[in-house]
Amino acid sequence: MANKDAALKALIEPVVTAMGFELWGVDYLSQGKHSRLVIYIESADGVTVDDCAAVSRQVSGVLDVEDPISGEYRLEVSSPGMDRPLFTLEQFASFKGSHVKVKLSTPFEGRRKFQGQLAGVEGDEILLHLDGQEYCFPIESIEQARVVPQFDN
């Protein structure tokens, strides 16, 4: 997780938790005038559009006061969904056996994108089975990771 994301998470998490939700993750995408702050929330009872709107209002108030992001940005609050992003080692461990897409911050063996079966977590590395090989990636080298839903015919 980037330093900016970690700082935003520390600011946002108490608000989300106080509202009865779990903060699944925070993703700040700096793209000039089109920057986005995406907050993923989860609940045992599920997440509705009204839940997202309520969290958005509360978090927006905190962000307006604390002002951790310079310039304009769009705030989005969402459930993680079926193709949920993975941010922490605990999240990776809980999706062991699932298919995942991983994008690295720097190339490994000439490429940055990998898709395969999540074999587990060892220390601070995730293990990925791909084309009969096992790859180990330190969590800090992962720029993005998502679960790839599998549908049976």
UniProtKB/Swiss-Prot annotation:
- Quote the Pfam families the UniProt record gives: DUF150_C (PF17384), RimP_N (PF02576)
Keywords of the record, alphabetical order, are: Cytoplasm, Ribosome biogenesis
Q: Which cysteine pairs make disulfide bonds?
A: none
| Protein's cellular compartments | Cytoplasm
Report the record's Gene Ontology biological process terms.
Answer: ribosomal small subunit assembly; translation
Q: Which domain of life is it from?
A: Bacteria
> CDD domains of this UniProt entry?
YlxS_C
Question: Which Gene Ontology cellular component terms are annotated?
Answer: cytosol
- The main location class comes to cytoplasm
Protein family membership: Belongs to the RimP family.
Record's function text: Required for maturation of 30S ribosomal subunits.
Q: This chain belongs to which protein, by name?
A: Ribosome maturation factor RimP
Write down the species.
Answer: Chromohalobacter salexigens (strain ATCC BAA-138 / DSM 3043 / CIP 106854 / NCIMB 13768 / 1H11)
